[in-house]
Structure formats: C-alpha cells, structure tokens
Amino acid sequence: MSAVRRQVRKRRGGVVAVRDQDKPLFVSVDELVSYVTDGDRIGVGGALLTRLPLSALHALAARRPKELQYISWGGGIPLEILLGADCVAKIVFCFSSLDIFGLAPLFRRALEEGTVQYEEWPAFAFTAALEASKQNLPSMPFRVPRGSDLLTNRSDIARSPDSSVEVEIGLAPRRDLDVFVMHAQRVDEAGNVEICGARGMDTLAVFCAHTVLVTAEEVVPVGELGHLRDSFVIPRDVVDHIAIEPYGAYPTSCLPHYIADFACLADVTSVSPPPVPPRPTGAASERIREAPTLTHQRIRETVAEVVAARAANDAPPTIDEIMVCWLAQRISNESICSAGAVSPLAVTSYLLAKATHAPHVSIMMTSGGLVDIALRPMLLALGEALDTKSAPVQCGGEDTYRWYYQQGRVTCEVVASAQIDRHARTNNIEVTSPKGRRVRLPGQGGMADVADLHRDFVLYQTRQSTLSLVESVDRVSASRAVKSASERETAGLVPGEIVLVTNLGCYEYDMASDELVLASVHPGVSVEEVRAATGFELRVSDHLVVTPLPSPATLRVLRDEVDPLGLRRLEFVSAQERTTLLAECIEAEEDLIARALHWV
C-alpha cells in the first residue's frame, strides 16, 4: 500500500531537505528500520513500560547500524536492545533502568567502562532542548536546578541574562533528531497517527525529527481517528513510513489493545540483551487483551473475593507498612502527588491516603501522563489500564512539567535515593564501592528539577546503612537549593519541608545547621542502632519521639484494599529475594485477572 505524499520541508543538521514523495508510506517492519543509517541521532517513543516500539527496535538491532546517538528521556529496554547489538556510540538521557525489574546492565557497563560517550541531562533542560528544535529556534530557556551538579562544566549550556539570585535561567541548545521511532495504537490510510493514554515525550519528539517511523496495531479508514477520549493525532505531514505490526509494543502495553505482560517482561529482562519475545497465544493473549475491559468496580469485587478467601492478617505492622502509613499521613485532600519511576512504596502511600483520610488528593501516574486517577488497588499491569480509564487528563510528560511542576503546584513526589548525605543532598548517578569500583546508577530522571519546584522534598531509603546515609555524597544529583520561606516565595515557589524516612526512623531538615536531624525512631529501634547505620555524626532532636504505629483500621485498608498483592515489599528485599517476590506478585495478579474475567 502506498499513498501520494505531500512535499514537506524538514530540517536535518541545519540544512532544509525535501522528503522523497516516491518512497512508500506503508512498508514492512524490516523496510521501516532500513531508513535508519549509521551515525543517526535516534529518538524512541513510549514511556517506562508503555507503548515502546520493541518490534521495530529488535528489527533495527538485527541490521546493526553503527555509531547511533540515542537521544531520549529514558533508556530502559530500548537502549539495552541497541547496546546489545553494538549500535550506540553516544547516549543523551535523563534516566535508564528496567523499571520494577531492576538496573539496566548494559547501560551500566557501558558507562562504567567508558565504551560509549554520554550526556546526562536534567529533565527540564532536556525537554527545553527538544522544544527548541520543535519551534525551530537555536535554544530554549529553562530553570537551572541549582541544587544539582549535573550541569557543572557544561559549556554548551549558556546562562540567560534574565537570571536572578533566586532563579537561574539556562539556555538549552536545540536537539534535533534524524529519526524518531514510535509505536501507535492506530493509523489511518492517509498516514495520520493516533496515540492514546500516557504520551511520554512523543508529541514533543515527533516534531524534532527529520524522519518519523511508526509501527501501529491497526490501520483504519480516513475519518476514524480522533474520536477516542484524550487521543492525540499526529498529522500525516510529519510521518514518513508506517508498518502495521500487531503486538508491536509487546510485552509492554498498548492500551486499549493489551496490557503489559509482566511475566514475559520478567523473562526478557532477565537476559542481556533482552531477546525477541514470542508472540502471545492462547490464554496469555486473551488475558492481556481482555484485561483492559475490566472496570474499577469489578476489580474491587474480585480483590474482596480473594481477600475473603485467605487467612486474616492480624500481625503487627511491618516496617514497610509503618513507612507507607507515615508517608500517607503527610498527604491531604489539597495535595497533588506525582509518581516517579520504580516507586511502589510512594504510589502505595498516595493510594492509601486517597482510600482513608484524603479522598480528593490528585495523583499523577505514568511519567505524568495520567492526571488525577481514581482510587484503585496497587497493581502491576492492571494499574495502568485502570488509570487510563479514570484519568480525566491524559497528556505528555512535558505538559505536566509546564502545567504543574514549573508552576509549583505539586505537593510532593516521594523519591528514593541510593545515597543521601547530612545536608539532604542526594545521589542517584554513581557511587564508589568499598573496593573503589565505580558503580553506575540509573540517574536522577527529574529529581534535580523537582527538588526545588515541589512544595516538599520527600526522600526515603528502605535499607539505611553507612554506605547509603553518608557525610557527603559522591555526586549531587538533586538537592533543595531554595530553602527558606522567603527565598521560595521570591522565586515563585511554595514554602515547604525537607524530610527523610528510612527503615529505622524519620528525619527533619534543620535550616540553621544545614543538616538532617533524627526526629523519630520506629518502634523497637534504638538511637544507637540508627547511629550505627549513619555515616555522619548523628544529631538527635530534643523532641525525639517514637514513630506512631498505624491503626488496625488503616492496616486493614492497606493490606486488604490498597495493596493486596504486597507490592510495597519489593523495595525492602535483596535482588535475589526481589526476583522471587516479584514472580509471586505477577502470578497473583494473573490469577486476579482470571477471576475478574470469570475464567475461574
């Protein structure tokens, strides 16, 4: 199938080029990726475990183009596939992990061994660089995250004369893409492309690329697109080639066609690089395709049935439950809470608050793409499906950055950090092991920006030790630079707090001494135990208390309604234990889906 194409003038390396009208619009996946050439600057669509163009990337890896520059907010599975085929010479990114499945091994090895070049960007600077390309400008202003050292020695990023003492403005140079590869739910016969649900950075990056390559679940007649709630239609004028590829995002999700297959994801992420997964068939195919039809009410009913069939849990609260409940108590009806990547503990605390004392809290999920979700249980693949049904606002990550983050509207984004020092500076970039080895971490994502912008800077560690709570971090990925109420008001920010909760106790930040102070110890924990697990001289509050235990009623809601699978526990166990626990949670969710669909 082909179509008569309209001439469109697009940029490549500063030179205006004319698209070749004679090349076919609809092609095979193998032909689609043949348009990627050695040295291309390539961007990848989707977000986290949502709508990743994995079929196209596996086909691209099989061709083994060389010297690619991978330019994307996130790395994850797409970057692992391309690194495994030795395609990548440079990475421009904000964050890279395998989400709930752990660290990204090839990304870590490449940066630790120096086999690829890389640029690590704060999220706002990265989106500003893409926005400059989208608007055909040389640069775009952004608020410099003053509490991070990410931009230290970055001569390519100038400072604006509009900077002030309170607000430093940087100028991000434009970032053009030679190729953008994405997966979509539907396209029409003319080449218009429709995406639904959380958009990642797709609606920004697609307008920065010289060549746009799309795989899609299905093709429909002209006039069919744009009628689904919160869908976004990319005009055919910016789309170059399309391959119709059912399951083109599998085993990640492509709603409403199918949810993510977490069992398959566990298999492919356990191998490096991730292999091509077998196409789902039989019951597995039916499960992921039928699950998006399930309603909140049906899931609540099924959870209640499952809970009623198991033994009552009257055990005392565990440390994960104490931490979740403490975090939830910080949330009110007026709160706006954003969920970062790989944060089961944080999301559980938001949902617990919504289920108990703060029913009107607004929660943003899936990289900010799903805003103000309805209450639902803490789940894996089903969580995104339910959130997509309920979120009244579905947008791109850059949209929530502008609408919420830069406006200072977000109350908190509860975030974990591998290293935190006495001054509440965090490090998710890299650490040095006790043996002196450089250990690469996933990166800060957007922490560098939100440390100042959100009202509260809320941190957590689930396994406090002298290696994680240190005198001084090896790198400062994020910290709050604008601290006092007067400074924050002058900078147009909401005054707030800096707090840390660990598996041993809770800390508050004392501005006068610029340090974290132990404010409470968890039940059964002594100050001496905390001191022994702290890498700096511990200061204890004169008003030290014991962290309150959650009430029996709150515990029941947490265990039976909010987190019946126990996903909050995933952040409290070793890597080996995590694999086993995650497998149990995946199996439990698959059973839940089967019951909800009346299969058992």
Model-predicted segments: where are they?
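Conserved phosphate- and dinucleotide-binding cores of soluble alpha/beta proteins
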Residues: V4-V33, L48-A62, P78, C87-K90, ...
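Flexible, glycine/charged-enriched surface loops at secondary-structure junctions
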Residues: G46, G223, I319-I322, E334-G340, ...
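Short connector loops at secondary-structure junctions
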Residues: L79, T366-P377
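A conserved C-terminal secondary-structure "cap"
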Residues: C254, A283, D542-A596
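N-terminal low-complexity or amphipathic/hydrophobic leaders
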Residues: I42-V44, L49-R64, I322-G369
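Cofactor-pocket helix-loop regions in the catalytic cores of large enzyme subunits
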Residues: L25-V29, L49, N313-V324
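Short active-site oxyanion
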Residues: E67-Q69, E334-C337, D514-V517
